């Protein structure tokens, strides 16, 4: 039998299928995703949960005229398949390949580039307002998960949508999870709604039955609508949304395409914003993902039979952080941990298992997490806030205003710093050195290897002011084990003493700098290699010492050049006479796409081979310039 999936070549092909063919298509898409992602890795569990819902949306909408905005966007794989991108899935999240998130440059059926949480309603509402002001006619649908509803931005947008009263469909994809199980009052509220699922089915059934009564049926429906407001407080499950000014429809079975089609048509007939509450099952159709959905959030390539990873690496920096936090939990009763819905991802799961009353998962609410930690610190506790670098950007004002301005002892464990690889622009942590370094009272550190991360965390918890420690995704570096001088505030570590060329490396770039140093030695140079440890405060004493017998200072960081470590060093030397030349190795002023970290470092010319070549060229230019000076 010919596969239905083979008929899907471009957007709107799904409209040619019968309902039974769509149901077969859903199973074929699941089979395809399970097989394909076992080779490439990717966000499996969330995508398996929205297959029927996505097909129903594609039967309802007309692409690219209508606009579908995905919150976060990691669950848009079925959408990509239905818009003609199935053949590219072998390249998913690889260098130059298919993105794991919606990308407007990839398809005109992708309405908005996403990657972070709780943004879809705001973006969709903006499209709605633009549509109406320009007198255009198309549908806008925003899909947001129940986990994303723990983020305050979603409520700001819902409030605005209710005020504007524009025709706008919002789908709440409720699978009871973000990455892990949701927390907080909204989660409890949605639990209550799920228990009342028959309400919408009953309401629609009564309305249809009344309309069939000759002559008086429509009048009875009108009367029912006029009186329902007095009783719906007792029975309606979505009262919170109704009270905000939105029409609530649901809960609806997110795996029943017939029911989904009916409720989408009903939403289209309504005036004003409509929220459709859809119940889905994360990982549906693949037993390992249903049992362990968090493990299959952003899965590495896996064995289909077991769901286990095809390869297991050495301990990561996150693993090291996890181990140290558990040890601190044993010894220091005032140490507490704060997570913004990323407990397993940041390595806090074991800490939470051992000390559940000292782990605070606040949901997808980075701004709240930081100010909450400020309050914990004021109350005499020692909070450690573990957040991915790209998500910490969302709380810049809170770090500056609520923590740094009051000089509070909050430790920021900044995970996934630098280039993270396959998730691309939205997830690289390339800006933290710049925005954290500009904040008064903030200390900024970066470890060269796994032992230094442990030492830095111990040092940070002892401080009486804010400290940020940034470390990368992936396996922790185990080289330079013998270089473990005690951590001193603002002091760097000289790994090799040389002359003429000094390489000042930050954090993960020390590993690269070690290879660069060896390459330069093979070319006849004797470079000095420095592990900076601190980006703020800088080791000014060391910088002055290096002036004496070095003509070229090369800084290396896995951060954007603008406002970063290198520019700070350049500013220091620029204010002094007879200073060495400074050259910066950093990420240029552009967003870095997805791909392997190795490929991306080469693209950015911050890998060891590229840096060696650049230093040799700079040194050659410097020598030519010296030769041209008049005697």
Where are these regions (language model features)?
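Glycine-/acidic-rich phosphate or pyrophosphate-binding loops and their flanking alpha/beta elements
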Residues: 262-265, 297-298, 316-331, 347-353, ...
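Peripheral docking tails and interdomain loops at the edges
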Residues: 301-302, 309-313, 421-423, 443, ...
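Cofactor-binding active-site loop characterized by glycine-rich and histidine/acidic residues
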Residues: 43-164, 317, 334-335, 340, ...
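Long, well-ordered, tryptophan-enriched scaffold segments
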Residues: 5, 176-321
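N-terminal amphipathic, basic-rich helices that act as targeting or association modules
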Residues: 1-82, 246-248, 253-260, 277-280
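Structural signature of the thiamine diphosphate
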Residues: 220-288, 409-414, 433-482, 581, ...
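A glycine-rich helix N-cap at a beta->alpha junction
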Residues: 88-98, 163-177, 198-201, 404-416
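Non-catalytic terminal/interface segments that mediate subunit docking, oligomerization
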Residues: 67, 272, 280-393, 398-408, ...
